[in-house]
Amino acid sequence: MDSLPKIWLQAWETLSTRAIEGLFNYVEPYKTYRPYLRVWRVAAVSNERGASTKTGGTTTPCTSLVDTKFGTMYDNVSNSAWCGLYDKGYPGQPGKTLNDLWTFVSEALPENATETANNGGCAVVCIMNVPVYKGLVNYYTGTKRTIGFVCASTGTTGSMTGYENVFVHEIGGHAIGHLADCYISS
């Protein structure tokens, strides 16, 4: 979880547990296949709580910078679900990258898990400690990496905007299930 000062470790414990339970206790096929999937939780302590904000565009500077472990950002435009990191740093942004996150997680995993992670056998999820309804998953075919970001939405548990549902949608649907969104407008 990014943007987690040390005093918030209990919040990370609660949010990560809610995410795992939301995926494996209520949603098929994950409920049935739970014994075949391994989950490791890795806490990362940040200097500040929150995430940097920006308005559209990969190279757009942030409108506010927050000093977090992974430098996560989110687009504060209401119709954008973008949140996370880029593959390289840009001026006016926190300067941290997807590779920084991947390296931190890889180094924290048990030895036997690192090979699986580096061969496309896992998805890394970064829970962003900001109360907004946003989530995103990126696939990187060249490196066989799948990295997802889920913000700690304050929507009602069990509702479409509830944190657990956003986690299930992004991680169960996109990161693990490799399903695409299908939106229809009238």
Language model feature labels by segment:
Residues 1-5, 23-185:
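Active-site-proximal segment of zinc-dependent metalloprotease catalytic domains
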